């Protein structure tokens, strides 16, 4: 049966999830998880939570799914070791450096690819499986046919998001909260700017064009199960325990009874939490305005619903009784023996408790029924006597206290065995290699977004690399420019399995394009065997030195540093590979499956629109591959007038052209070459000096 995975943002939510039927829970401890504002767990609480869950047959997944700096990796390594020793069943990861570290130091600990890894194709899922991921959490934007295709072709388990909040941006690719407020969604500190009002091609009023309704896929569980989805995930580590109880309980019943939700259950889900109702738009492939909604302020608490929910888990309520088979032997001349058997992970365990010799009855002999009644008294434990066998010689006496003591001893031992932690290896981390000599003098590269931006005037300024969106190559003639720069095809950050052969064909048709920019793990399947030089784009979220080394092992000759990093952190990355950073241009804040422009003012046929926030700041909305949207920062990044750019070990500084004219592109590269770049009121330093939380 498909696993039901529930959120546990704190201990009360954990008990709510377990007592309402979760097969597994996901939770975090420490700072390294994607919901840092959840209560989370101390080390002691987490160890206790693991024992609580394992005793009841519930698996525990630790969320270490954030991006980490070099200085944070030792702390994350310590968390991995603790998790392995505590018996955690799997760890969710996003960071490429943490992935390699985990495989080194706790090689027996199962790893799951977080949705923050931005995996949405069969090639990406299989690449994750080849890296040792036992499970892949797919992007929430996939429709059911796409999920079915990945389930059928992937060697790893597939986890699908079933209920709860939807981000507007693809997980792992959102920089809006980071760039605007230094709170990184990639580090568990998202400020949720998508829930705020914005105007589209006009002033900000009361519209919320980035606020998606919560997903509710309760009507499609049989569909998911039949296509091979291994796990259904419920969102809500920031939600109340009562919410967790309500949602988990309903989904548990739907899975067990293989049915659709009743009208009452649907109302309960909406009462527990919703934003103007729910959406199943992505699952059905129906994008558009009906998917969007808001939650009014001061929504009254559903007191009656939540009161009933609390009754399911408060005051030591135990809904998950573990069946145990008991056999009591009372014979003359032999010690009283109580044997018991119950399920444990991987099989069945058998325990024997031995007491004193039975006595000859002086008045009345003990009966089989009396012994049976004493053995059924398992209250206060998670066990329930299922089958009881009694082998009793006539005329003997065994006290109630003796039978009770044997029962307690046996059940305690069974509990200990269910909570046993697996024996796992723990190995030292390999040291980072000796850093080679620093990079050569920084050179400038450019990326264009329209064919008209590539001109002879631009190439006259000698860019080291010209990045061109791969989907534009068939519309451009690069023949006149061969030899003037390295042309690099930029594969789209967001694409689908059906696009893999399309882009492979494009790359094969253009031998004049020497290299390809990789922005997603799934791109490796597209470029394999083509002989192109591979370069890492910013979509990879390269955050630390081990991530740099990981991508070197995948064949990349250069990487682009995450633009969330401060210049000192970028300097650390440049020690191990040719490193590139954005030094000019609009920073991409979001890439979205829903089209902001079409939903608000109608399709602009590639022209895009402008988003305006409450303070009057304007953000260009550009058309991205596949009729997706990319929201750009309103201010332009300018860094090349700062000396730190040239002192932080960068091999390349990229000028990212989006809204610029062809003449502006050439003039800007000329100014960078001449060292005459200046910042003004419409520019920003990005996060180069500020960094993020």
Which residue stretches match the model-derived regions?
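Active-site pocket-lining/capping segments in soluble small-molecule metabolic enzymes
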Residues: 1-119, 137-141, 146-231, 238-693
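Long, basic N-terminal domains or extensions that often function
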Residues: 134
């Amino acid at each position: 049966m498909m696993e039901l995975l529930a959120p546990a943002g704190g201990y009360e939510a954990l008990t709510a999830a377990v007592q309402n039927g979760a097969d597994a829970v996901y939770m975090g401890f420490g700072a390294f998880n994607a919901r840092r504002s959840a209560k989370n767990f101390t080390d002691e609480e987490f160890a206790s939570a693991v024992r609580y869950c394992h005793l009841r047959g519930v698996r525990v997944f630790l969320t270490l799914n954030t991006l980490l700096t070099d200085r944070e990796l030792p702390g994350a390594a310590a968390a991995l070791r603790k998790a392995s020793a505590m018996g955690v069943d799997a760890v969710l990861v996003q960071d490429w450096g943490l992935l390699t570290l985990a495989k080194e130091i706790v090689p027996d600990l199962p790893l799951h690819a977080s949705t923050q890894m931005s995996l949405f194709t069969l090639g990406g899922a299989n690449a994750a499986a080849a890296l040792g991921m036992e499970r892949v959490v797919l992007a929430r934007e996939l429709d059911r046919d796409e999920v079915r295709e990945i389930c059928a072709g992937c060697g790893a388990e597939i986890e699908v998001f079933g209920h709860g909040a939807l981000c507007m941006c693809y997980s792992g690719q959102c920089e809006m909260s980071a760039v605007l407020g230094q709170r990184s969604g990639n580090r568990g500190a998202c400020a949720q700017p998508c829930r705020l009002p914005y105007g589209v091609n006009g002033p900000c009023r009361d519209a919320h064009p980035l606020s998606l309704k919560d997903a509710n896929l309760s009507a499609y569980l049989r569909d998911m199960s039949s296509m091979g989805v291994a796990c259904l995930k419920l969102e809500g580590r920031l939600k109340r325990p009562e919410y967790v109880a309500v949602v988990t309980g309903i989904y548990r019943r739907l899975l067990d009874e293989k049915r659709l939700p009743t009208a009452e259950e649907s109302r309960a889900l909406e009462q527990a939490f919703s934003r103007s109702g729910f959406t199943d738009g992505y699952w059905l492939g129906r994008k558009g305005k009906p998917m969007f909604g808001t939650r009014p302020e001061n929504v009254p608490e559903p007191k009656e619903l939540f009161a009933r929910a609390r009754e399911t888990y408060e005051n030591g309520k135990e809904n998950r009784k573990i069946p145990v088979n008991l056999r009591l032997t009372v014979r003359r001349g032999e010690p009283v023996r109580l044997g018991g058997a119950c399920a444990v992970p991987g099989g069945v365990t058998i325990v024997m408790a031995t007491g004193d010799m039975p006595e000859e009855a002086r008045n009345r002999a003990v009966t089989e029924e009396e012994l049976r009644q004493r053995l059924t008294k398992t209250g206060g434990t998670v066990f329930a006597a299922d089958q009881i066998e009694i082998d009793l010689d006539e005329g003997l006496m065994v006290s109630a206290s003796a039978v009770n003591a044997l029962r307690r001893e046996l059940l305690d031992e069974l509990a200990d065995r269910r909570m046993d932690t697996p024996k796992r290896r723990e190995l030292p981390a390999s040291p980072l290699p000796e850093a080679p000599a620093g990079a050569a003098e920084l050179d400038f590269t450019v990326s264009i977004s329209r064919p008209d931006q590539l001109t002879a005037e631009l190439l006259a300024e000698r860019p080291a690399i010209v990045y061109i969106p791969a989907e534009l190559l068939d519309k451009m003639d690069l023949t006149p420019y061969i030899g003037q720069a390295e042309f690099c095809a930029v594969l789209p950050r967001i694409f689908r399995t059906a696009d893999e052969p399309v882009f492979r064909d494009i790359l094969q048709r253009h031998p004049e394009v020497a290299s390809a920019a990789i922005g997603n793990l799934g791109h490796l399947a597209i470029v394999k065997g083509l002989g192109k030089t591979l370069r890492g784009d910013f979509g990879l979220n390269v955050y630390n030195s081990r991530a740099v080394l990981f991508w070197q092992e995948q064949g990349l000759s250069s990487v682009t540093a995450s633009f969330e990093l401060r210049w000192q952190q970028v300097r650390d990355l440049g020690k191990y590979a040719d490193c590139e950073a954005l030094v000019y241009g609009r920073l991409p804040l979001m890439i979205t499956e829903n089209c902001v422009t079409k939903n608000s003012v109608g399709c602009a046929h590639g022209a895009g629109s402008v988003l305006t926030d409450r303070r009057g700041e304007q953000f260009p909305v550009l058309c991205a591959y596949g009729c997706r949207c990319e929201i750009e920062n309103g201010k332009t990044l300018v860094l090349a007038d700062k000396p730190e750019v040239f002192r932080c070990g960068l091999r390349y500084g990229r000028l990212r052209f989006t809204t610029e004219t062809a003449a502006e592109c050439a003039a800007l590269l000329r100014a960078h070459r001449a060292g005459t770049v200046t910042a003004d009121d419409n520019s920003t330093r990005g996060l180069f000096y500020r960094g993020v939380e």
